[in-house]
């Protein structure tokens, strides 16, 4: 054992404790007494106002005798007083406001400027009354010593100029401006004059501008202060648009050329940006002889002596390319492109092994400037593709694009990720050139980059899968080999972060995957992940996004066995899950299924599991189900679903009679009233439900076509796998037998018309199925997955009904429906044992059916229902 520590080390004696207490008592004595109130009784008395005063009287009193904070409150409330009682406000309150503003502080001045602007925008008074009462107050405070206050009043005045008549502008603003713009006035006064002149040019005719405004403009362009010259230069764009092309060429352009050679860098920068913005006004000669040499000079000086213009130059490169397109000689074109490439890698060549803390501040500032330049280059990359022609992208710009996608700075990669969709559109068939860069950005370590990329991820992937010369099917399998690992890694990275909105957005965008990759790839790589997110994630919007995307995956899954497995998982793990949270998510999933699938699909698989939750022990689950019941009822069709309607009504009655939770009971009562008001949809088309029934019919057709496609693929695989002798024997057998015998035994025939059909008709039936399947493959997956409630257009409907040669609509639908029933009976996976069957609700189960038909009780009633629907368009 270790020896005990010495007594000195354990300082917990009674004396030491008393010493601590004495120290604490001393601290309490030193403490200053805390005031119980922030205001003294005298101050409270001064701030108290008689509550019987009207709003106008209270405002007058506070502006006269109140404190500054009370006066500011009255001025902030001035727009309300103007709306309530404009006459009294103008007569009694506004004079007090004028008096208060003479000695007001910054806060009251800013509040007044904002209130005056609000009154103008609200149109509480006429323009004439506003001019008479408010304009002089605004003009009086334009030259306030505080720059922020002066700018606030200036913004108000510029808005007032938009609505004032010409005569008022001339007498109240333009005439006084002549003296305000003189050199004898303050710099602030001349700066204000520059901005007012830029606004006035759009209000007068060219003659007045030439005679009264342009002399002032020239004078201010040659002002001794660089701030004034720069400010006036930035207003030349507005002035040029007001005076027309001729005066711009003769007056504005010479001033811009002179200002572009100014000694002040801010003036040169303003001149350059104004020239770029005015490119469309100048003709080809002016661009080639005057502006192009200036741009060339700017580009050369930017690297040598004037780096301050680099950021602006890189930002306006796109406009320059567009405005000077067709003017460059081949040599100038090449030099400009090389200049852009140089900007894209600016600062990347300067490698150093210093720590960021050891880098001098000047170097850090320069690196920030270079990052901004590269970011602007990324922003203008689509414009540069147009500049070099997309056909030359690989030779001219691919290496630059590669550098931007791999830039060490996040803002650069973020910007190029935003532009990625535009780049993909411009490349069109050459989009395959940037496959690797898409994967790189999907795997980027920064979630900001991923978030920017996924905004247009469905459109990008669609271009990737359909671009080039190969077909859609080939692209789905071969063109993006690294896409699936990149997508899964991106989702896992988003899930591991705290940025759940990015995760939610990514899951929503995954709904486009059925158009890009195969059904099996989605099933094995993404479906289980959606289940995991629904079961384990803690963020509700993320869970809902995963649920909706899973429903879309299920909607376009092309294997019935996989579909059944997913449905069973949804019901067992969510609908019958131990956690009430999972059962709530099951109801969310049911809502998405109602939206995405046909009514018959929901009724067959999810109707009964959903209404069984009326017996759930958790009140929140029952409450959520009550909100969903109107949508559940809307999936029923009478008379085929009469038995389901009876079960729904029985569950609602039990809730009304047995519900003990008062909140749930209140919602049940409201839901019952809503259910009673609902009109039921019939099997036959009704005028009021025509559009909804048509959309539902289209969804059902697509679901049946998926089954047909699966059956055709299996038949094709079986035929491809048999020996040649078997195929020859089958061909001879088909030639000698009747068409009815040549069809599979488990598909009953329901074809009206003659009993004998030629062998060619059998081929036409299969051919029509193949045509419909191919048309569905080409059309159904092109739907906008964000709006799946809007199904395929009428063209697909026409293609479906007119593709059958020699047979009517009834026969085709009968065959399709029979195959649907047969698949239900024959292709259920082995995991579905008789003891735990997949919950299924069939319409018309009360009718008896010959068990030899297809093994499903509802085959004939279902067939009749479909026939009646198709025969009543």
Swiss-Prot record:
Region called Disordered, residue ranges: 713-766, 822-873
Key words of the record: Coiled coil, Cytoplasm, Phosphoprotein, Repeat
Bias-annotated ranges (Polar residues): 822-858
HEAT repeats, residue ranges: 213-251, 252-290, 392-427
GO BP, sorted A to Z: blastocyst hatching
InterPro entries assigned: ARM-like, ARM-type_fold, HEAT_type_2, PPP4R4
Modified residues (Phosphoserine): 775
Annotated signal peptide: none
Function of the molecule: Putative regulatory subunit of serine/threonine-protein phosphatase 4.
Oligomer and partners: Serine/threonine-protein phosphatase 4 (PP4) occurs in different assemblies of the catalytic and one or more regulatory subunits. Component of the PP4 complex PPP4C-PPP4R4.
The protein, known as: Serine/threonine-protein phosphatase 4 regulatory subunit 4
Organism from which the protein derives: Homo sapiens
Originating gene: PPP4R4
């Amino acid at each position: 054992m270790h020896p005990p520590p010495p007594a000195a080390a354990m300082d917990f004696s009674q004396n030491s404790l008393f010493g601590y207490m004495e120290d604490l008592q001393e601290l309490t004595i030193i403490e200053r007494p805390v005031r119980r109130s922030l205001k003294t009784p005298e101050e409270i008395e001064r701030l108290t106002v008689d509550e019987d005063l009207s709003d106008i009287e209270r405002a007058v009193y506070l502006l006269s005798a109140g404190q500054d904070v009370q006066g500011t409150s009255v001025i902030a409330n001035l727009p309300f007083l103007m709306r309530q009682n404009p006459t009294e406000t103008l007569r009694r309150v506004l004079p007090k406001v004028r008096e208060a503003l003479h000695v007001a502080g910054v806060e009251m001045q800013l509040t007044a400027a904002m209130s005056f602007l609000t009154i103008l925008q609200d149109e509480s008074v006429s323009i004439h009354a506003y001019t008479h009462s408010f304009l002089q107050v605004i003009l009086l405070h334009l030259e306030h010593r505080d720059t922020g206050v002066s700018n606030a009043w200036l913004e108000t005045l510029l808005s007032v100029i938009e609505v004032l008549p010409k005569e008022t502008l001339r007498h109240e603003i333009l005439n006084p401006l002549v003296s305000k713009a003189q050199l004898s006035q303050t710099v602030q006064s001349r700066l204000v004059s520059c901005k007012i002149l830029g606004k006035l040019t759009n209000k007068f005719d060219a003659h007045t501008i030439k005679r009264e405004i342009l002399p002032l403009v020239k004078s201010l362009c040659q002002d001794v202060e660089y701030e004034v010259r720069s400010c006036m230069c930035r207003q030349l764009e507005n002035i040029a648009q007001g005076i027309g092309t001729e005066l711009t060429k003769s007056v504005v352009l010479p001033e811009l050329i002179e200002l572009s050679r100014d000694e002040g860098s801010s003036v040169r920068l303003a001149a350059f940006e104004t020239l770029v913005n005015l490119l469309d006004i100048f003709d080809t000669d002016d661009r080639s002889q005057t502006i192009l040499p200036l741009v060339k000079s700017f580009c050369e000086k930017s690297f040598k002596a004037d780096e301050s213009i680099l950021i602006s130059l890189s930002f306006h490169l796109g406009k320059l390319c567009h405005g000077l397109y067709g003017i460059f000689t081949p040599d100038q074109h090449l030099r400009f492109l090389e200049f852009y490439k140089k900007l894209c890698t600016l600062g990347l060549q300067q490698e150093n092994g210093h720590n960021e803390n050891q880098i001098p501040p000047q170097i850090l500032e320069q690196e920030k400037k270079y990052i901004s330049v590269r970011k602007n280059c990324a922003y203008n990359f689509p414009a540069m593709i147009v500049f070099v022609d997309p056909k030359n992208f690989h030779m001219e710009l691919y290496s630059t694009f590669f550098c931007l996608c791999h830039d060490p700075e996040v803002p650069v990669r973020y910007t190029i990720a935003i532009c990625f969709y535009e780049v993909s559109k411009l490349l069109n068939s050459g989009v395959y050139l940037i496959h690797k860069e898409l994967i790189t950005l999907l795997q980027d370590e920064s979630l900001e980059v991923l978030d920017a990329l996924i905004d247009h991820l469905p459109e990008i992937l669609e271009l990737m899968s359909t671009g080039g010369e190969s077909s859609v099917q080939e692209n789905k399998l071969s063109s993006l080999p690294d896409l699936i690992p990149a997508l899964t890694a991106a989702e896992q990275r988003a899930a591991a972060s705290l940025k759940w909105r990015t995760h939610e957005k990514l899951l929503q965008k995954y709904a486009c995957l059925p158009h890009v990759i195969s059904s099996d790839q989605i099933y094995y790589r993404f479906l289980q992940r959606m289940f995991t997110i629904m079961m384990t994630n803690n963020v509700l919007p993320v869970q809902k996004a995963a649920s909706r995307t899973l429903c879309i995956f299920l909607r376009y899954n092309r294997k019935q066995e996989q579909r059944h497995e997913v449905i069973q998982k949804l019901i067992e793990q969510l609908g019958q899950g131990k956690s009430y949270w999972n059962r709530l998510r099951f109801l969310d999933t049911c809502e998405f299924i109602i939206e995405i699938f046909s009514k018959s699909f929901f009724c067959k698989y999810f109707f009964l599991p959903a209404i069984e939750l009326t017996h759930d022990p958790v009140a929140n689950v029952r409450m959520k189900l009550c909100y969903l019941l109107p949508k559940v009822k809307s999936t029923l069709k009478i008379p085929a679903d009469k038995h389901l309607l009876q079960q729904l009504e029985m569950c609602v009655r039990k809730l009304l009679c047995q519900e003990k939770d008062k909140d749930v009971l209140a919602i049940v009562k409201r839901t019952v009233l809503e259910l009673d008001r609902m009109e039921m949809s019939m099997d036959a088309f009704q005028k009021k439900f025509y559009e909804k029934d048509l959309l539902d019919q289209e969804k059902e057709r697509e679901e049946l076509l998926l089954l047909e496609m699966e059956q055709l693929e299996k038949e094709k695989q079986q035929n491809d796998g048999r020996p040649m002798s078997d195929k020859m024997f089958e061909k001879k057998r088909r030639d000698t037998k009747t068409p009815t015998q040549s069809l599979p035994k488990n598909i009953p025939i329901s074809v009206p018309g003659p009993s004998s059909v030629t062998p060619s008709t059998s081929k036409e039936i299969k051919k029509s199925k193949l045509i419909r399947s191919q048309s569905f493959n080409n059309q159904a997956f092109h739907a906008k997955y964000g709006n799946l409630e809007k199904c395929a257009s009428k063209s697909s409907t026409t293609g479906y009904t007119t593709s059958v040669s020699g047979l009517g609509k009834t026969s085709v639908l009968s065959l399709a429906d029979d195959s649907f029933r047969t698949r239900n009976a024959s292709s259920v996976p082995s995991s579905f044992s008789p003891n735990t069957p997949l919950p299924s609700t069939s319409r018309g189960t009360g009718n008896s059916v010959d068990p030899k038909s297809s093994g499903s009780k509802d085959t004939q009633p279902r067939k009749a229902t479909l026939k009646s629907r198709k025969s009543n368009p």
